[in-house]
UniProtKB/Swiss-Prot annotation:
Chain's role: Testis-specific histone H1 that forms less compacted chromatin compared to other H1 histone subtypes. Formation of more relaxed chromatin may be required to promote chromatin architecture required for proper chromosome regulation during meiosis, such as homologous recombination. Histones H1 act as linkers that bind to nucleosomes and compact polynucleosomes into a higher-order chromatin configuration.
Gene: H1-6
Residue numbers carrying Phosphoserine: 9, 143, 167, 182
Compositional bias ranges of the Basic residues kind: 111-136, 148-157, 163-175, 187-208
Record organism: Macaca mulatta
InterPro entries noted in UniProt: H1/H5 (IPR005819), Histone_H1/H5_H15 (IPR005818), WH-like_DNA-bd_sf (IPR036388), WH_DNA-bd_sf (IPR036390)
Matching SUPFAM superfamilies: Winged helix' DNA-binding domain (SSF46785)
Name the record gives this protein: Histone H1t
Gene Ontology MF terms: double-stranded DNA binding; nucleosomal DNA binding; structural constituent of chromatin
Residues with the Phosphothreonine modification: 159
Ranges of biased composition (kind: Low complexity): 1-16
Citrulline carried by residues: 58
Amino acid sequence: MSETVPAASAGAVPAVMEKPLTKKRGKKPAGLTSASRKAPNLSVSKLITEALSVSQERVGMSLAALKKALAAAGYDVEKNNSRIKLSLKSLVNKGILVQTRGTGASGSFKLSKKVLPKSTRRKANKSASAKTKKLVLSRDSKSPKTAKTNKRAKKPRATAPKKAVRSGRKAKGAKGKQQQKSPVKARATKPKLTQHHKANIRKATSRK
């Protein structure tokens, strides 16, 4: 006799379908840009010149600061420490770099004026010209104030003699008026002779 397989009941739970396994992509390292990923392929000398062209330090960039800039660009500084020093020496010998401080690979470095691009030269010239203009403007702004103070000090000196001249004129005019008035007063004070006095004077003269 053949055995019959019991049919699956309608209420039975269906088997859970397994999801296909997907490969997880590795996360990109944080802080690295496209330029920094390509940095290991570039030569050390190019990276050094680029870092020095960006720096705005007049004295130059120290070796420690250079290493920090190279590490930020994605270059392995610890493994290639000797290569960095050799490239610095060769760049100094070629005249591309100028060593401002220290001796050998240790010290401060900056690009020579011949290697600097035109854009950086123009920026440096503009900054220098702007500083000189500010100094000239500050000097010009200070000079008018001193001139005004001198003018204010000179004004009372000019007005003082005018007052003295006017007072002298008034005094002279007053003296002249007094001299003119005084003889008039003297004439007025003389006693007038009456007819009686005149007759007495005539009698006195006839008796003599």
